[in-house]
Amino acid sequence: GVNYAALNKENGDRKCFIPRNDFLFELDIGAYHPTLLGKLVDYDFDSGDIHMAFSEMYGVDYQKAKELTFKQMYGGVFEQYKELEFFKKMTVYTDDLWARFQNEGSIECPISKHIYKKEYLEDMKPQKLLNYVLQNLETAMNVCILWEIFKILKGKNTKLVLYTFDSFLLDVDENEKKVIEEILKVFKNKKLQIKYNYGSTYDFR
């Protein structure tokens, strides 16, 4: 089978995919995991671009900031950044999560209410547990987003044709452009940053 999520964006592999309606419209959630972690630890990013906010915190360029953030989210905070407010809150949250997991034998995830039980999880560590909760939150949030999108598209020619983690691809009817505005509001109401592409092929070029 074809892994559509892994199609190369640069070499034209995507160009053969065309809409049944009039054009394709792709929404990508920016800095999804840092955003969700911010919600968990009650940290509000002032910047419109979260990776830019981290870039300013670290004093490094944009791409390096993305790399540093993900390394610390999944592998633990580096010594030189432990005093940054975001990571201080992340550390407090992780420690509290771990304490509850150890003392009560389980933790409940937000939104999904899924319960991770200590007795079923071997070789668990504080950072790993945080990652479990974060990825569960991503899935739960996406289910909520998809539900809202499906309600908007009910009875419409416009369809959601592909969903991959933080990306949503629509096949849009030219006469139903208003649904795009409604769908964008779904992401805005959840305070998620969005980038989008559109075009006559999946290549968007």
Predicted regions: what they are:
Residues 53-163, 190-194, 198-200, 204-205:
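Conserved catalytic core of nucleic-acid polymerases
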Residues 170-174:
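Short beta-strand-to-loop capping motifs
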Residues 175-193:
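Helical (often loop-to-helix) elements that flank the catalytic cores of nucleotide-handling enzymes
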Residues 1-60, 110, 114-150, 159-169, ...:
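Acidic, glycine-rich two-metal-ion catalytic cores of nucleic acid-processing enzymes
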